[in-house]
C-alpha cells in the first residue's frame, strides 16, 4: 500500500533514522527506499510543495504564483568531517557552508543553493533566479536582497532571468540591528 510506504518515509524523516531501522509494523526498508527513489526522480515532492504553496497563497487572498521574492544567504558552521567542501566566510568568521535561498513575500521557500562559505552571494544570483523562475512558472518580476547582492553582474544575472533585482540598504544614520523593510521574511525562513 502506497500510503503505508509514505507513512514509513515520514517516520524516517521525522526520526532521522537509517533506512534499515524502520519498525516492523511498516513496510520493508527496501520497498520504502525503492518507492521513495521513484518519487524523487519523478519530482513528486517538488510538485506537492508547489501545489501546497499555491493553495496557501490563494487562501490568503493572493495570486497562486508570486510576483516578488526575497533573497538572502546564511553561513552554517561545519564540522571537522566536511573537509575541503567547507570554505571560510571572512565576514562571519566561520568555516562551513553558505545556504543561498529565495522565498516569496509570505516566507515560503522557492529555491535553495548550497556552496562553500567563501562563495560570494552575488555570484549565486543567476542560479537562484533560474531556480525561482522554474519553480514559479516565470511569474516573478522583482527580487529584494541585502547589500551582499550589489553589483552590475548580479543585476544583469537577474535581468537575464526576467527579474528586477532591488537592493534594500541600511539607513545611513542607523547603527546596530535595524529591521529592514521587505527583508524580514527571509530571516525567519
What are these regions (language model features)?
Residues 1-189:
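Short alpha-helical elements
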Amino acid at each position: 500500500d502506497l500510503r503505508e510506504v509514505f507513512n514509513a518515509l515520514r517516520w524516517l524523516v521525522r526520526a532521522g533514522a537509517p533506512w534499515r531501522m524502520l519498525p516492523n509494523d511498516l513496510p520493508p526498508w527496501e520497498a520504502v527506499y525503492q518507492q521513495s527513489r521513484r518519487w524523487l526522480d519523478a519530482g513528486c515532492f517538488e510538485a506537492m510543495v508547489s501545489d501546497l504553496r499555491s493553495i496557501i497563497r490563494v487562501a490568503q487572498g493572493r495570486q497562486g504564483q508570486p510576483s516578488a521574492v526575497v533573497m538572502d544567504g546564511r553561513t552554517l558552521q561545519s564540522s571537522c568531517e566536511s573537509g575541503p567542501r567547507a570554505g571560510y566566510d571572512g565576514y562571519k568568521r566561520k568555516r562551513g557552508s553558505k545556504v543561498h535561498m529565495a522565498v516569496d513575500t509570505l516566507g515560503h521557500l522557492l529555491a535553495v543553493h548550497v556552496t562553500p562559505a567563501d562563495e560570494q552571494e552575488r555570484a549565486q544570483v543567476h542560479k537562484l533566479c533560474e531556480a525561482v523562475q522554474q519553480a514559479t512558472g516565470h511569474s516573478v518580476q522583482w527580487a529584494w536582497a541585502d547589500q551582499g547582492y550589489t553589483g552590475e553582474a548580479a543585476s544583469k544575472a537577474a535581468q537575464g532571468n526576467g527579474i528586477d533585482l532591488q537592493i534594500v540598504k541600511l539607513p545611513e544614520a542607523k547603527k546596530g540591528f535595524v529591521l529592514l523593510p521587505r527583508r524580514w521574511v527571509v530571516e525567519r525562513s
